[in-house]
Regions:
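Alpha/beta catalytic cores of group-transfer enzymes, especially the acyltransferase/condensing modules
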Residues: 1-39, 162, 175-181
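C-terminal nucleotide
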Residues: 28-176
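FabD-like malonyl-/acyl-CoA
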Residues: 173, 185-186
């Protein structure tokens, strides 16, 4: 499926969707390291809370969105860091504490892409920690922070996703977009 999306559809996508479809397990979250392809399951117990997935009903084609542009931008970040003697295999290897030192080496929009990747990596690990501690309110806070980063640093949300997220937060403990973004679905 991944080869088809990349080679025939022209979408420079990752492997998360395929892994979720093939390895998804009821009442569990799948923690996937996309660089090593190692994965593990974590029990999802929300107590009296429910997990809802909403759809914008706004059609879009990822190949016609800025999705591939975001992939290229992340590649540019790696190249610029390499020119500055910072060699990494993927952006998530950058530590949060190193972001301040790196900021002046990148144009603002590329720094924000990097900051999203690095802080999202931490949010994922914090989410797993909160999940293992059954801290549902912390899970909601992390979802909110993630969406704000996707909106402001990675810039992949859009009007429809932001509207749903904003409305959901009025009655939910947390809300974030899921999928590739750009306000719609294929």
């Amino acid at each position: 499926a991944w080869i088809t999306e990349v080679n025939y559809c022209g979408l420079n996508c990752g492997i998360m969707d395929q892994y979720s479809i093939a390895l998804g397990k009821e009442n569990h979250c799948l923690l996937l390291d996309t660089s090593t392809r190692k994965y593990e399951y974590h029990k999802l117990d929300l107590g009296d809370y429910k997990l809802l997935i909403l759809k914008t009903n706004k059609p879009r084609k990822l190949t016609e969105s800025k999705y591939n542009e975001r992939v290229k931008e992340c590649g540019f970040v790696k190249e610029i860091l390499a020119l500055n003697n910072i060699k990494i295999n993927n952006l998530c290897e950058v530590k949060i504490d190193d972001l301040k030192k790196i900021k002046d080496k990148l144009p603002d929009h590329l720094f924000r892409r990097l900051r999203h990747c690095v802080t999202e990596q931490k949010r994922v690990l914090d989410f797993i920690d909160a999940l293992n501690k059954n801290d549902v309110l912390k899970l909601g806070k992390i979802l909110n922070e993630s969406h704000e980063s996707l909106k402001n640093d990675y810039e992949v949300t859009g009007y429809y996703l932001d509207s749903i997220t904003s409305s959901a937060r009025k009655v939910a403990i947390g809300s974030r977009m899921t999928g590739a973004g750009f306000s719609g679905w294929d």
